[in-house]
Amino acid sequence: MSELSNIKTLEELFEYWKTKQSNDSGKETCNSENGYVVATNSFYKDGIVNPEEYQNSALKVLFITNEVSIDCKNDVDEKNPELKGNGKGGHLVGNNKGNTVCSFNRYISDDEQETWSGKMRIKFGEMYRIMTEENYKTKDSIDAKANKEALKKIAFMNLNKRGGFGSIQRDVFLNYLKKYKECIRKEIELIAPDVIVWCACNTYDAEEYMGAIFEEKVWKEKKLTLKKGKVPILRMWHPSVQ
């Protein structure tokens, strides 16, 4: 029996996943660029933004993107000696206590401005409203309040929990997906969405990477079979695309 079969919550999964990552050499699964190497124990939690709102929402939507873009100026070993890995004479980067759900909630509560590439959080809120509001109409200006209310009802996950440098390093990313595919599947199962929005049209070969996680027929049918039944997968442009 898989160790994952006994895991019942996202928090339990993330602890298991992070420990497994930390014990991985990272040789084939950690991004590196310009003297920076992603730490093996770098881990950005994600998941359900507001569990109560999500469970009570008319449509449970999970947005999936590839990986966090690491801030190498601030999330670096010089400022965080707890980062582990092989810096290869350069610097380890990442965040061993990262949490994108906290970032969503800081934005919702006006404690943080929208600084994500392409105004991602704004666009996720807009996407959710387009999918769920019967009389939704595009306006010249964004309804920030309505969008923030919408964000409370979504779930969000990155596939590569370590993070990267803003553009996919194909081989490393593919190796990561293959190595941690059971964890990725488990997270989706625990989130239990009604619809998956795969934000991938312009960032990587979705068919290849989808195939590394799921059986080929899943992508061809555009439906993922969970305990609750078949869940449709919508493929959209990544929110950072202008």
Predicted regions and their residues:
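C-terminal capping/extension of enzyme domains
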Residues: 1-15, 170-185, 203-242
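A polyanion-binding, active-site-adjacent surface
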Residues: 2-191, 195, 201
